[in-house]
Regions:
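Alpha/beta-hydrolase fold catalytic core
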Residues: 1-34, 54-57, 96-97, 132, ...
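Active-site loop/oxyanion-hole signature of alpha/beta-hydrolase fold enzymes
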Residues: 15, 54, 60-106, 138-144, ...
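Conserved HGGG/HGGXW glycine-rich cap/lid loop of the alpha/beta-hydrolase fold
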Residues: 23-72, 76, 256
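Conserved hydrolase catalytic core segment
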Residues: 97-143
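Flexible "cap/lid" loop of the alpha/beta hydrolase fold
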Residues: 123-169
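Conserved alpha/beta-hydrolase catalytic His-Asp/Glu region
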Residues: 162-221
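Conserved serine/cysteine hydrolase catalytic core
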Residues: 198-258
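Catalytic histidine-centered segment of alpha/beta-hydrolase-like enzymes
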Residues: 271-284
Length: 294
């Protein structure tokens, strides 16, 4: 597969006093397209997608707070609304409207939230496994007492405070860990993602760029009814994508697709959670067909 791509330009912007990073793929006069990565990933996850679409769109891809080359927060404040706010700030500062947005996992949740809050600003939206926890998981969590969830959250934050970033003796060791986490990856993909997702320590070892605190999720129960209300306000054409080999449940089978006014669902065979990596060519075909429908 082709993995060598000419790189984008790096920029910074500020949101809630944080110095956040994004890349710009040029083509300033083309329609705007925003790409938002998932948890513990980074903006260069999108390089192959951006390379394919850059001739037709002005593409920007941010590093979410605590990820990639964006600043870490003080404390452990990595909530959904903060991520959404950061995206709102970036789009507002660049006046990037009307925008087509594509997000993966956490990023897929962020773009759906933003599209429901500001439906008038969105042209089209693609969410790759971005609907949050499956309904069955939400039901199981809601059965657990709030006091127990809070106690476990406090213990988790305390444990994270003593957790040092993992160090890999060589870059190849980090690449191997990347490929272990997603066996679907081509070796060249794994290397590319690792090169852009690590920094080299003073002793020569390598560590992931993301803040370990992004691993911690809110102890408050996922509010499905509020999510459904927000999704119902997404007036732009919406494409929900899922890998058939992923843990994510089918939004048609579990009923969540019913909350979107204008929606299409695509299940990609042979793909796990990272559909845009696992089956890149098929993913691009599906997305291109969807975007060309304008």
């Amino acid at each position: 597969m082709q993995t060598q791509v000419s790189g984008p330009a790096s920029h910074v912007y500020f949101s809630q006093r944080l110095r956040l990073h994004y890349v710009d793929w040029g083509n300033q006069d083309a329609p705007p397209l925003l790409l938002v990565h998932g948890n513990r990933d980074h903006c260069r996850n999108w390089d192959w997608v951006a390379q394919s679409l850059r001739d037709r769109y002005h593409i920007i891809a941010p590093d979410l707070r605590g990820h990639g080359d964006s600043q870490w927060v003080y404390g452990s404040n990595y909530s959904m609304i903060d991520y959404v706010y950061d995206i709102a700030q970036l789009l507002e500062q660049k006046q990037f409207f009307p925008v087509t947005i594509i997000g993966h996992s956490l990023g897929g949740s962020v773009v759906l939230q933003y599209a429901g809050i500001y439906p008038e600003r969105i042209r089209r939206v693609v969410s790759i496994e971005g609907l949050g926890p499956p309904p069955q998981m939400i039901a199981q969590r809601s059965e657990r007492p709030a006091s127990k969830r809070m106690r476990e959250w406090i213990s988790g934050v305390q444990a994270m405070a003593s957790r040092a970033p993992r160090c890999y003796e060589t870059l190849e060791d980090a690449v191997a860990r990347m490929q272990e986490a997603n066996p679907h990856l081509h070796p060249d993909q794994a290397r590319h993602l690792t090169v852009h997702g690590t920094y080299q320590n003073e002793d020569g070892s390598f560590s992931w760029k993301f803040d370990n605190y992004v691993r911690i999720f809110s102890p408050y129960a996922f509010n499905a009814s509020e999510a459904h209300e927000i999704w119902s306000r997404v007036s732009a054409p919406t494409l929900l994508i899922r890998g058939t080999e992923s843990w994510a449940s089918d939004p048609v089978a579990d009923g969540r697709v019913a909350h979107f006014p204008s929606v299409e669902v695509q299940n990609i065979e042979g793909a796990g959670h990272w559909v845009h990596h696992d089956q890149l060519e098929r993913f691009l075909e599906v997305v291109d067909d969807f975007l060309q429908a304008d």
